[in-house]
């Protein structure tokens, strides 16, 4: 059981790091063309390439890496995303567990909203995201 908990924690840490990198703005840096490389950046609607200085942090080496890390198609975000993950009531529950602030996609306002999660599901478990950024990536119409 401890091994499973450790694995889940490791996955959560990697996911959080990936989300942060997806949201980093592209920085050009200052270098001549001979020191530039192409990296891929998430733009909110997909991954696009851009020339950057070779020592620039952020971005992905390939379009596939960017897609895997930053889009629903890459499987990084809630697998129920799309119509199922971006609709219905969030899983508020009332199990008496510790209250945790999470985000869900409100299909009426087409925005990501907060809700109090209490450790069990009484709504759509796919419409629950740990961060607002994760919700906006999974439900693109939230950020447009």
UniProtKB/Swiss-Prot annotation:
The N-terminus is blocked. One of its GO terms (molecular function) is serine-type endopeptidase inhibitor activity. This is Monobin. It comes from the Eukaryota. It comes from Argas monolakensis (Mono lake bird tick). SMART domains: KU. Residues 1-16 form the signal peptide. A motif (Cell attachment site) lies at residues 92-94. Tick salivary thrombin inhibitor that plays an important part in the anti-hemostatic strategy of ticks. The modification Pyrrolidone carboxylic acid is found at residue 17.
